[in-house]
Amino acid sequence: MIAVNSRNSLNADMTSLHPETLMVHGGMKGLTEAGVHVPAIDLSTTNPVNDVATGGDSYEWLATGHTLKDGDSAVYQRLWQPGVARFETALAGLEHAEEAVAFATGMAAMTAALLAAVSAGTPHIVAVRPLYGGSDHLLETGLLGTTVTWAKEADIASAIQDDTGLVIVETPANPSLDLVDLDSVVSAAGNVPVLVDNTFCTPVLQQPISHGAALVLHSATKYLGGHGDAMGGIIATNADWAMRLRQVRAITGALLHPMGAYLLHRGLRTLAVRMRAAQTTAGELAERLDAHPAISVVHYPGLKGQDPRGLLGRQMSGGGAMIAMELAGGFDAARSFVEHCNLVVHAVSLGGADTLIQHPASLTHRPVAATAKPGDGLIRLSVGLEHVDDLADDLIAALDASRAAA
């Protein structure tokens, strides 16, 4: 049990608390002592230093990836920020990680992980498609000095080289919701660190570090924030990787803005409730859509036959709130479908309160190589918090209209 006035010492030992409690109280240490109930938003871009010597020492300490020492000056917002640190502490606890490092966007987080691998002399990456289109594009261009081998899950071990720095997977995968067996991937990777994009599941449904992953990445813009009003990325990992990531962040200036940190940290407090509500709706929607003649196949982990390896229960605690579907009429049918939706919003992104629909091959996965791009008939749906009947009515009406227009 948590004592009534224990927020001074909260986070000292929270390992015995349930995830729902961690989401509410994580990163809240010291609030009672400060006389406040919620964290303050510190917008300072610079911080006073006591003298030249200690200021210089603090600067060097933080710029090389260390965390702020008690009593030291943070010197400059690019090096360390208190609200960002609170968000990091909260997310690390949820992912069973030693630490977490937050960034301005999810792509900034991915960039930092790749740069850390390059700087360590291990620029080769093994990646399993599909991935988020931005991640795929970044790897394919080699812009950061990386080289990539695209491998099937079963071929990871044979793809690893002496200079392989990371194995990168996303599960469920964006946009098709393919499932990856993390135990199998970690075993195949051997001593090579595995980075898992956990954006679709969130720590509510999946904790990759518990399966041996070294780094867990989130586009915090999505479910963690949950309201479509703050951008950010975050990686939960061990202390060694966290130090390397903070150094890259300090050098590249990719720190999450304090206002974004506040909103994303606040979003964590309702994450479990939002995620489970959206998941319930998604499961029912997937079944209704699966029966529609305009759809050739619905991809949703919770549907019968779509989890042949039994990852639900063993790796994931639920099917999540994302749905992918393939329209029998291909691109023309897909385009007509999304353009006939009224309640459901035609937009990229995901994980917010409202339901979003988009055509990945035209938008989020447009830069992906033709051989790996999603099919022209595939649609991605991020299920929100609306009533399931209202969503079903809108989607089925749009499907019917697209068939009539064919």
Swiss-Prot record:
Q: What is the activity-regulation note?
A: Is inhibited in vitro by carbonyl reagents, completely inactivated by DL-propargylglycine, and unaffected by metal-chelating agents.
Keyword list, A-Z: Lyase, Pyridoxal phosphate
Q: What is the reaction catalyzed?
A: L-methionine + H2O = methanethiol + 2-oxobutanoate + NH4(+); L-homocysteine + H2O = 2-oxobutanoate + hydrogen sulfide + NH4(+) + H(+)
Q: Name one GO biological process term.
A: cysteine biosynthetic process via cystathionine
Q: How does activity depend on temperature?
A: Optimum temperature is 25 degrees Celsius. Is active between 5 and 50 degrees Celsius.
GO MF terms, alphabetically ordered: cystathionine gamma-lyase activity; methionine gamma-lyase activity; pyridoxal phosphate binding
Biotech use, in short, is: The recombinant MGL protein cloned from B.aurantiacum eliminates L-methionine in cell culture, and exerts strong cytotoxicity in human cancer cell lines in vitro. The cytotoxic effect of this protein seems to be attributable, in part, to changes in methylation-sensitive epigenetic abnormalities involved in oncogenesis, including DNA methylation.
Q: Which residues bind pyridoxal 5'-phosphate?
A: 76-78, 106-107, 219-221
What cofactor is needed?
Answer: pyridoxal 5'-phosphate
Sites where the protein binds L-methionine: 380
The protein's pH behavior is summarized as:
Optimum pH is 7.5. Is stable at pHs ranging from 6.0 to 8.0 for 24 hours.
The cellular component terms of Gene Ontology attached to this UniProt record, alphabetical and capped at eight, are: cytoplasm
Q: Where, by residue number, does L-homocysteine bind?
A: 132, 380
Q: What is its EC number?
A: 4.4.1.11, 4.4.1.2
Q: Sorted alphabetically, which InterPro entries does this protein's record hold? A: Cys/Met-Metab_PyrdxlP-dep_enz (IPR000277), PyrdxlP-dep_Trfase (IPR015424), PyrdxlP-dep_Trfase_major (IPR015421), PyrdxlP-dep_Trfase_small (IPR015422)
| Entry-annotated residues carrying N6-(pyridoxal phosphate)lysine | 222
Instruction: Return the similarity comment.
Output: Belongs to the trans-sulfuration enzymes family. L-methionine gamma-lyase subfamily.
The record's subunit annotation is: Homotetramer.
Annotated function: Catalyzes the alpha,gamma-elimination of L-methionine to produce methanethiol, 2-oxobutanoate and ammonia. May be responsible for the production of methanethiol associated with desirable Cheddar-type sulfur notes during cheese ripening. Is also able to catalyze the alpha,gamma-elimination of L-homocysteine and DL-selenomethionine, but has no activity toward L-cysteine, L-cystathionine, S-adenosyl-L-homocysteine and D-methionine.
- Protein known as: L-methionine gamma-lyase
Natural source organism = Brevibacterium aurantiacum
Lineage, broadest ranks: Bacteria, Bacillati, Actinomycetota, Actinomycetes, Micrococcales
